[in-house]
Amino acid sequence: IWDLVDPDGVESITDVFYAVDDTCAECWDTLGVVPQLTLTDIEPGFHIFYLKIRDIAGAESSVIYFPDSANTQEPDYWKVIPVNGDILIVDDFSFDTQNNALQWFKSVFDTLGETGNYMVWELEKELPYSQADVTANLNYFKKVFWYAAYTGPELYDNASTSIEKYILNGNHFFISLAEMKDTSFTWFPIDSLVTISDIYGFSPNRVLYSQINSTLDLRTPDETGIYLDNLIGFESKDSSSFQSLYRLEFPPDDPYDPFNGIDVWDGTPNVCGVYHKQYGVGKAVLLSLPVHNGYEPLLDGNGNFSEFIRYLIDVEFESE
């Protein structure tokens, strides 16, 4: 983002010029009065964007550009990458510096034969400044699989407007999250929340019961739970648009279970559901539990998490 200034006031600026890769006399185009610019049909590879202005007296500014190697606060490269496939994996887990969660999530899609049909967007610490850029990145793909952080910052809530536009455009969206930062998602209405963990977390060897097919039941590993407090389940009363995909059953009461008495939820809370507002609009699937902690997967105790993803791709996210 660049702000235009002039000693005589911004009203004295008459022209804004931009160029890509070359600053020859014939290489400059006029930006006009629009506050932003979308570039299309750019060849894949590394590029440089140049900008300059001219005032009413005909004086031109110096040329600024991106990337600028002298600016350590910005990325030092701009690379255009061709879009491959119709699936986007969004890595919203910046604290996973070894990318263990990402490598596992990619392996799930590779196992399903989707190699070459997906791309990855690693968000790191912040989203692009413009919501238009976020929306554009999502809209290159028909299906988005977004996993939020187990611990540390996560950005999905800041992208809510773009996610809504993406779904309204007929595309499909899945998200797994550890913390429900907002319950007013317009793209996934929620009526009530249920606490399913306290300071002890969510125990190992606990089953998420599929409401579709028991072969899709998911389970936490034998020795690893989800050690986060304030995990939640959720409900939606919109029976015409909402369908539960996974519920918990009553916490087990087994004196031989080493984790007996730790789990605190009441009833059979929903932890994953699909929301489909109307024909012609895409579907949203919300899983209110994290899928990976940065060391190992958390819902693959049965070795079938990939089958759940296959179900989403082939059934829920199948084009109408």
PLM region descriptions:
Residues 97-192:
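Helical hinge/lid and interdomain linker segments adjacent to catalytic or ligand-binding clefts
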Residues 39-46:
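Surface-exposed, short loops/turns at beta-strand junctions within beta-sandwich domains
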Residues 26-34:
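Short beta-strand segments within Ig-like beta-sandwich modules, predominantly Fibronectin type-III
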Residues 256-320:
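Extracellular ligand-binding/catalytic regions of CAZymes and related secreted enzymes
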Residues 150-249, 299, 304:
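A glycine-rich, often tryptophan-bearing local segment used as a flexible ligand/cofactor-contacting loop or short
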Residues 47-53:
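Hydrophobic/tyrosine-rich beta-strand signature of extracellular beta-sandwich/beta-rich modules
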Residues 5-22:
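Solvent-exposed loop/turn segments flanking beta-strands in beta-repeat/beta-sandwich domains
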Residues 54-63:
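Short, solvent-exposed loop/turn segments at the edges of extracellular beta-sandwich modules
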